[in-house]
Amino acid sequence: WRSPNYYEDTANQFKPDGCELPVHKSFFFYLQRICNHCTYPACLAACPRKAIYRRPEDGVVLIDQSRCRGYRACVEQCPYKKPMFNQQTHVSEKCIACYARLEGADPLTDGDAMVTRCISACVGKIRLQGYIDDPESPVYYLVRKEKVALPLYPQFGTEPNIYYIPPRWAPRGYLRQMFGPLAEQAIAKYSKPSHELLAVLQLFGATQKLVYSYAVEDTQVIGFGKNKQEVVRVPIDEPVIVRAEQHLNIT
């Protein structure tokens, strides 16, 4: 449960004794791995009980616990290793994309759609949620228009719906293997972002409500909810404050 993808993405390894084969240099970057809620889920196709289904309204892939008999076909067939077999309940479990929050069931947002728990709790503000088929969505801009957010291992053929902005400091060949042939192009755009791209990046982690559309102004970006109500307003360029010498945290 803790690390089903261990060593799948890592580049470092122990040096063998006796003889030494050519190995690439060690590097590290953090890659959060969650269920991709694929358009063509391998887990769904593999389940002999038809216990896995994809919700048409939002694309969330779920396991019907009442139908699952613990055959573990989904565990075997998912290329991302996200369904896991629970030894206590004897059924498979996986990320549910916090669908209750998407439905507006959380009282914190007064019935408005809310982002998932992993997004709202992320202190690094590295995640953003939205609908990729809506041209007004910031996610649509990142994936379809600017093409800086790419799917993980697109060669698996499941059409995953979690997208990543590739890191700049990892070897390019490795990134092409993970994110496809557009990895270098995405890094180039992200390294020197346009005004609109920089604005959209400021929406990451800026609100717990789902941002359906946005508007970019000269100095700030505004995020709107489903009914075009404003849910967040953030500056595009964060102010830099230089502290006086007597307040510097140095010895």
Q: Residue ranges of each PLM-predicted region?
A:
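Non-ligating segments of multi-cofactor redox enzymes
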Residues: W1-T251
